[in-house]
UniProtKB/Swiss-Prot annotation:
Localization: Cytoplasm
Superkingdom of this protein's organism: Bacteria
SUPFAM superfamilies: Acyl-CoA N-acyltransferases (Nat)
A GO molecular-function descriptor: leucyl-tRNA--protein transferase activity
Family classification: Belongs to the L/F-transferase family.
Keyword Acyltransferase: yes
Protein name per the record: Leucyl/phenylalanyl-tRNA--protein transferase
Gene Ontology CC annotations of this record: cytoplasm
Amino acid sequence: MRLVQLSRHSIAFPSPEGALREPNGLLALGGDLSPARLLMAYQRGIFPWFSPGDPILWWSPDPRAVLWPEQFHLSRSMKRFHQRSPYRVTLNHAFGEVIEGCASDRDEGTWITSSIVRAYHQLHELGHAHSIEVWQENTLVGGMYGVAQGALFCGESMFSRAENASKTALLVFCQAFTQSGGKLIDCQVLNNHTASLGAVDIPRRDYLDYLSVLRGYRLPELFWVPRVLFPGAQ
C-alpha cells in the first residue's frame, strides 16, 4: 500500500482498498476540488480532509462510521426537549451560513478551509450538497451539511450554538430522510458525539457495498426542495 499522487488531468481515484492503515484510510493526495472530482470521490466512498497549508488529502477509512436513520438514539432527555422544542428546522434555506458555522466551530472547523467552502458551495449550486438549518426565532443556532448519493447521505460536519441544536438537526433530518426512502447516513469516522446518537462502525467493504446499491436509488423528486422540516413544538 502506498500513497497515490493524483493528477490534475484525470479525476480517477485508486481503489479505496489500497488506503493506508496508518494513518487510517489515507488514500491519495493532490488533484483539485472540482465538482467532477468531488462527485467521483463520493461515488467511490472517498472524501477530502486536510488542514490549512497541507496538500489536498483523500480518505476512505476502515472501519467506516454510519448511522441507519431509523436507529437514531433518542434519549429520554432529548425526547422531552424535542417535545417542547424552541427550534424550527429547515432544509436548504441557508447553505452558506451553515458551512460557515461549521468552519468557525472550534472543535470541527480547522479542516474546513476557504477552498473547501468554495467547493461545497459549487456542489450545492449543482444540487448535490445540502444543508439542514436549526433556527431559534430568526437566528441560526445549529445545522449540518453533506452530499447526497441517492438513498445515502454523506454527512460532512455539524455545529451547535445552543442547547441540543445539532442533535435536533440530525434527529429531524433522520425522520424526514427515512420517511422519503433514505437508508443510510455516512458519518465517516466515529466519535463520541455521533456514537451517542446511534452511529456505529462497519467494515469499509460493507460500506462500499451499501454505497454501490444505495447511490442508484432515487428519493422523491421534491425531497431536496427548500422547505420547513419541523416548525417547532406546537
